[in-house]
Amino acid sequence: MTRFPLRAALTAGVLWGSALAGSAHAQAPNDRYWFEAQAYWPDVDTRVSVAGPNGVVGTTIDLESDLDLTDRKTLPAFMAGARIGERWSLIGEYYGLDRGGSATTSREINFDDVTYSAGATLSSSFDTKVYRAAVGYAFLKSDKGELGASLGLHVTQFKLTLSGQGHVGNAAVQSELRKRDALAPLPTLGLYGAYQIAPRVLIGGRVDYLSLKVGDYDGRLVNTEARLSYRVLDNVAIGAAYRYVDYNLNIDKERWQGELAYKFKGPALFLQAVF
């Protein structure tokens, strides 16, 4: 393959991933190992429902609007990766988002068979921890860029609590606390690309996707990132990225029956060490 078609294919792949709002896989082609620390500032939107053991359908709750959880929070993210041979690579990633708050609800809410009347003061928390691992293969590769596919596992731990004055059925109003948690291990397929547009400047992008029923979960996951980095030293790079993550899941577990729609998107700054 000539240099020009390879460059065109790489550039098209990166732009396509970025257009989807499109990474730890986006490394310079000759980097063997890398570690990255990231400060991510997402805009968060969360909707949940939890049915009770008696089959009563739960209210769809907007955690930011109904329960006043913050919709903006800076969180750390950590990534590491290694190349195996010329075309294979392994990456791992972790980040978490913990939020809590208190609000007076403006409408009646049913959560796990508990009814909280309008005007009740509710305390809540929603914590998530995300672990991502993937193996990638670069099917197009040159000295300046690469385009590849990945197979990964996106594991998310969700913990939700809600407490306040409420009642179950016809029982008297009293303080009620409900907790729910779920662990969602979701396989993903992805595309990634990177291209060195100048001696120390790299652009890159990634998109991971899932849309199927896996065990107790049925729905969709989209996880994308686009980035630009500058190599300030031979082994140190700084950069900026934009990340978009969107879960839309129906959950059918003993500890959680209901729905979860969880979306966060926003910019990030990162510092990277390469070897």
Explain the meaning of each model-derived region:
Residues 1-32:
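Cleavable N-terminal export/targeting peptides
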Residues 79, 134-136, 190-192, 225-227, ...:
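Outer-membrane beta-barrel architecture
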Residues 87-90, 143-145, 199-203, 235-238:
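Repeated loop/turn-to-beta-strand initiation elements of outer-membrane beta-barrel proteins
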Residues 45-74, 96-129, 156-184, 212-217, ...:
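Extracellular/periplasm-exposed beta-strand and loop segments of Gram-negative cell-envelope proteins
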Residues 230, 262-275:
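Outer-membrane beta-barrel "beta-signal"
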Residues 25-97, 131, 268-274:
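Short glycine/proline- and aromatic-enriched beta-strand/turn motifs that initiate or cap beta-hairpins
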